[in-house]
Amino acid sequence: MSSRSASRTCLALRHVAFEDLGTLEPLFRDRGFRIGYIRAGAPCPSVREWLEADLCVVLGGPVGVGDTESYPYLKTELDLVRMRLESRQPLLGVCLGAQMMAHALGSRVYPGKAREIGWGTVSLTGD
């Protein structure tokens, strides 16, 4: 679908301000998506808005899916993820979002031996 096609809606649930859709955002926009960001901990979208979006993305953050006692808003987000999965509408989970999807589908999600984040230094070589 090109940007000339009818506009579609992508809702992105963001857990920290500096973690957005990144390189996916221009790809989505080029395919006719209007992007709406929802800040975690702020009022979540209505169930209707969440289920009617053409695409939902749950982004990463510095917490884990098991941190619901410290971050109670994760419970609401997990409910939204479950509903979206049950609706069989497109849902993309990145990092924490993938944890939430796995948990909602009944998988055991647990911390690894070391913390990790999804970036690192890249150096050019002579090869």
Regions found by a protein language model. Name each.
Residues 13-15, 40, 96:
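Cofactor-binding loop segments of dinucleotide-utilizing enzymes, especially the Rossmann-like FAD-
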